[in-house]
Amino acid sequence: MPSKAENLRPSEPAPQPPEGRTLQGQLPGAPLAQRAGSPPDVPGSESPALACSTPATPSGEDPPARAAPIAPRPPARPRLERALSLDDKGWRRRRFRGSQEDLEARNGTSPSRGSVQSEGPGAPAHSCSPPCLSTSLQEIPKSRGVLSSERGSPSSGGNPLSGVASSSPNLPHRDAAVAGSSPRLPSLLPPRPPPALSLDIASDSLRTANKVDSDLADYKLRAQPLLVRAHSSLGPGRPRSPLACDDCSLRSAKSSFSLLAPIRSKDVRSRSYLEGSLLASGALLGADELARYFPDRNVALFVATWNMQGQKELPPSLDEFLLPAEADYAQDLYVIGVQEGCSDRREWETRLQETLGPHYVLLSSAAHGVLYMSLFIRRDLIWFCSEVECSTVTTRIVSQIKTKGALGISFTFFGTSFLFITSHFTSGDGKVAERLLDYTRTVQALALPRNVPDTNPYRSSAADVTTRFDEVFWFGDFNFRLSGGRTVVDALLCQGLVVDVPALLQHDQLIREMRKGSIFKGFQEPDIHFLPSYKFDIGKDTYDSTSKQRTPSYTDRVLYRSRHKGDICPVSYSSCPGIKTSDHRPVYGLFRVKVRPGRDNIPLAAGKFDRELYLLGIKRRISKEIQRQQALQSQNSSTICSVS
C-alpha cells in the first residue's frame, strides 16, 4: 500500500502545520526529535504520530501507481504530553497577574495554556513525551532568562523543558519582582529578646532520670504506653477515662497528675509461683517495683558523724547539718552516728525527726553507751526494707564507761545489703597501734547478719564483717591525728586565705596507715576539701587555745566499701562549721548507691517504724511554726508612737 508521503505530487508543497501549533523549540519544517527511551525507527515502517513537515521526494514507482491521487489531510494537532504540577500552575497564575507589557516582553506573544512558544532559532528539538513534572516545592520552574540559557547546554539532553523542571534558589526574589505591588511580609523574629523565665527547671533529678542504659533501652519505643493517674478522677461521677496515656520515657511530676502510680487489674489478678525468684511477676522487691521508684537504680544516701562531747545543750537548728545548702534535694536515707552523745537520747532523736519533717520516719535506732546511731528513711520506702539487725563491740574494760567501741546496724533494701558502723577509737597522738587494734576487734566481733540471709555468701569471710555486705559505710571519731606537732600544722593553716589541704593530708596518720594496708582494707574516702574538724574552742572558730594545745586534726571521717566496683559514688564530703556546741565539727557525706532487685523470701520489716517518735516530732514542728507566725504577727502589729 503506498504511503502518504508517496501520494503527494512533486509539484505540490507539503501542507504546513496550523499557526500557533508549533512545539516549543521546533523549527518550521523540522522533524520532531525521537523521545528518549522509545524504540528506534525501523526502515520501511512509519509512525502515524509523526506528521509530514517537509516536501515529499518523488518516488521511483510507475505512473499508474500515482494515477489515483488522494487528497492530503492536514496533519493531526500535535499533543503536548506535559503534566503540569500544582506548583507550575500556581507559578503560571502569578505570571498572568503581572502587567501585559511584562508578559509580552517575556513571551513575545500571549501565552497559551495548551502550547509553549519557541524562544528563538537554534533551539533543540522537543521530545514527543517529556516526563511529568514533580510537585515538589524545590522544582518550581525558573524564569525565562534562566530557561533560555539552559537550552543550549548539553546537560539538558536536548529537552528545553528540563530547565522548567529544575529548581531555583532565587524563587522568593523572582516572586517579589513579578508581583512588585504585593507588600513585604514582616520579619518573624521578635523585635526584642523574650523576657526571662520565672521558673528555673534545671534540676539534678532530671539529669539523673535521663541517663541512658548501655543497651539504649530509653530510646526504644515501648510496646505499651505508660499510664498516669489523673488527680482525682477515679471516684463515682467522674469522667469515663480516668487514666491518661503518657508515651514519654521520663515520668514527669505534673500538677495535673498524681505521683501515686496506678495498679492495673491484670497485675493484681496475676499469680506468681516463683517464690524468691528475681523473675517473679508482681514481686515486692522485684525489678518492676524497683524501676517504679528508682528508674536509674540509684538511691541517695546521707551519712554523718559527730562527737557531741557530752553536751546537754543542742544546737538551735540542725538544718545546716541535715539539709546542707549544696544539696538541692533531700536524700532518701539518713544515717547519723554520734559519739559522746547527749544524756537525753530521746530528745536527740526527736530533734532529728522534727528537722526532717513528716516525709521521713525512724526505721531503727541503737545505742552502745554514749554511741548512738539513728536511721531515717522516706516513709514510702519502708516497705522495701528487711528486718533491721544491730550489734555492738566494746574495746575497753567492761567496768569502765562505754565511751569507746563500735555500733553496727545492717538491713537489706530491695536486693542490696547495707552495713553501717560508727566507732570511737582510742584517743592520743601517739596511740596509732591501739587504734589499729580497735579496728581489728570490731571487724571480728560484730555478729552480723543473723536472720537476714547474705546476698552473696561466696564472697563473705567469717573473719571480717565488712565482707558479708554489698555496701558498707564506716564513720565516726577515729582519733587519727596530723603528725608533726602544733607548730607545723598552724604554719600550714595560716599560709593565706586558701588553706593548702593536700599539704595537711600529707601528715595524716589514717591515710598513711591505709596506704600500708594495716587498716580499713578495701575502703575508700572521698576527697577532703574542708579544714580539720578537731579541736575547737566551744562556741568559737579558733582551734584549741588551752594549755594542752592539741594539734588540729581530721579525727572525724566517713569511709565506704562496696562489693561491686562503682556501686558507690560520692557526691559531697564536708563539715558543718556553723555548729559550735562541741569541740568537734560534724562531718557528713552525700552518696549515690546502686541498688539491685531482690527476693521476697527474706524477713521483711513490713512497714515498721517508730510511730510515737513520728507523732512527737510532727507535733513539735507544728508548734514551732505556730510560735513563729505569732511572733511575726506581734511584730507587724506593733506601732511606734511619736509625740509632736
From Swiss-Prot:
Residues 10-242 are annotated as: 13 X 4 AA repeats of P-X-X-P. It holds the Pfam family Exo_endo_phos2. SUPFAM superfamilies: DNase I-like. Sequence repeats lie at residues 10-13, 15-18, 28-31, 39-42, 55-58, 69-71, 72-74, 75-78, 121-124, 169-172, 183-185, 190-193, 236-239. Its EC number is 3.1.3.36, 3.1.3.86. Residues 1-193 are annotated as: Disordered. The modification Phosphoserine is found at S99, S241, S256. It catalyses: a 1,2-diacyl-sn-glycero-3-phospho-(1D-myo-inositol-4,5-bisphosphate) + H2O = a 1,2-diacyl-sn-glycero-3-phospho-(1D-myo-inositol 4-phosphate) + phosphate; a 1,2-diacyl-sn-glycero-3-phospho-(1D-myo-inositol-3,4,5-trisphosphate) + H2O = a 1,2-diacyl-sn-glycero-3-phospho-(1D-myo-inositol-3,4-bisphosphate) + phosphate; a 1,2-diacyl-sn-glycero-3-phospho-(1D-myo-inositol-3,5-bisphosphate) + H2O = a 1,2-diacyl-sn-glycero-3-phospho-(1D-myo-inositol-3-phosphate) + phosphate. Its main location: cytoplasm. GO terms for molecular function: inositol-polyphosphate 5-phosphatase activity; phosphatidylinositol-3,4,5-trisphosphate 5-phosphatase activity; phosphatidylinositol-3,5-bisphosphate 5-phosphatase activity; phosphatidylinositol-4,5-bisphosphate 5-phosphatase activity. Phosphatidylinositol (PtdIns) phosphatase that specifically hydrolyzes the 5-phosphate of phosphatidylinositol-3,4,5-trisphosphate (PtdIns(3,4,5)P3), phosphatidylinositol 4,5-bisphosphate(PtdIns(4,5)P2) and phosphatidylinositol 3,5-bisphosphate (PtdIns(3,5)P2). Specific for lipid substrates, inactive towards water soluble inositol phosphates. Plays an essential role in the primary cilium by controlling ciliary growth and phosphoinositide 3-kinase (PI3K) signaling and stability. This is Phosphatidylinositol polyphosphate 5-phosphatase type IV. It comes from Pan troglodytes.
